[in-house]
């Protein structure tokens, strides 16, 4: 069955069109656009008009593509920014009405579970690290946790200067360590780490020296802790305008990559990981599997949800 999965993330809006058969997900098309849906949500607790407009413009393009490719089911999953926003459910209802997608607002636990489904089978000694714009999930065979350690959220809280000052970076690192120490379950231990999502894949691309992003080279790359520290030091020293011009880094990710790199450095230190394996399979692939299990749409049915938003 051909399906479409959409990830309404805090920093990016992503599309995967895939053929799902017997639990296997074969990519047909994959798109990513930085829309910063979570901009301002941490302080205002609302999705704001401009980010909503960016997402809607993106979804208009995505719907055109998934329809042209013949997707039979479409599932849009929403994570941290929509969870935190008081108008989040109304926003999803409006998307269902406007675009015809089935939507799901995921809890942190559900987000972790869907990410794990997307990554695929992992060993008992493996922890999956998912650093998003609004949250970071650590997912092990025994324990798992969803934290409010997101690259957008922490950039807005801590990194006001351009480039960030040492004091700001230190305060950010202390905050990350405190959350990890307080919230990581005791049974969440790892000999091996798998990293997913844009912060980690971007750092992998920089470590590989890619001028243009190549998912085939990024997937499976072992990103060492020394490489994370080196890229963080390099990126944090650059003003935003120069960071946007770094070869291999998507310009619109430049504002939040420093906070994301701090989170990764501290997570690896906390878990005792000397390296992390980078994966291109993530929550999108889990959402594709979930989309394949949706019932067939009924012609003329109105989608559920609230239809007035924001």
Where do the PLM segments sit?
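N-terminal glycine-rich anion-binding loops that anchor highly charged ligand groups
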Residues: 24-35, 39, 69
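Helical "lid/coupling" subdomains associated with nucleotide-phosphate turnover
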Residues: 3, 17-20, 40-71, 81-125, ...
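A short acidic Gly-Thr/Ser loop motif
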Residues: 7-12, 129-135, 196-200, 280-282
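Conserved ATP-binding/catalytic motifs of P-loop helicase motor domains
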Residues: 74
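N-terminal basic/disordered segments at the start of proteins
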Residues: 1-26
